[in-house]
């Protein structure tokens, strides 16, 4: 079995490269549990408001690509993958409202997947407003 992969770095051409990969029927993996690109949507994630990237929902709505929540867990004898059902891309309102609603659904799916093995989820930066407040209080 041959698996080919390619990293598309964040930058001015990233969007068009990802859209090209989608049109070529490639599988795209996007980091969705933190906002690294600055295009974000406010959602509730583990009971607190935070910002998550709008990219996955935006790309899926614009291209019709299937949006699947996926997690890979380390097990004693290797890795185990879980693929959740596709997230509905049904249009219910204005584009931005649909992006927000779908991004909230992504957050809920990530909560489900993270709860399966929370010790395997790692954040290397503050993710919630309360994280930044607690960092400021440390000496």
Segments from the language model and where they lie:
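Short, small-residue-biased leader/transition segments that mark boundaries at the very start
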Residues: 1-3
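Short acidic-hydrophobic, aromatic-tinged amphipathic segments that line or gate anion-handling sites
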Residues: 6-10
């Amino acid at each position: 079995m041959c698996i080919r992969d390619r990293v598309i770095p964040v930058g001015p051409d990233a969007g068009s490269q990802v859209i090209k990969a989608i049109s070529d029927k490639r599988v795209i993996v996007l980091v969705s549990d933190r906002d690294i690109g600055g295009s974000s949507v406010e959602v509730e994630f583990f009971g607190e408001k935070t910002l998550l990237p709008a990219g996955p929902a935006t790309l899926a709505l614009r291209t019709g690509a299937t949006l699947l929540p996926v997690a890979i867990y380390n097990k004693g004898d290797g890795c185990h993958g879980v693929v959740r059902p596709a997230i509905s891309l049904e249009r219910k309102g204005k584009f931005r409202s649909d992006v927000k609603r779908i991004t909230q659904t992504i957050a809920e799916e990530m909560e489900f997947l993270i709860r399966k093995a929370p010790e395997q989820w790692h954040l290397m930066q503050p993710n919630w407003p309360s994280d930044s407040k607690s960092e400021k209080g440390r000496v």
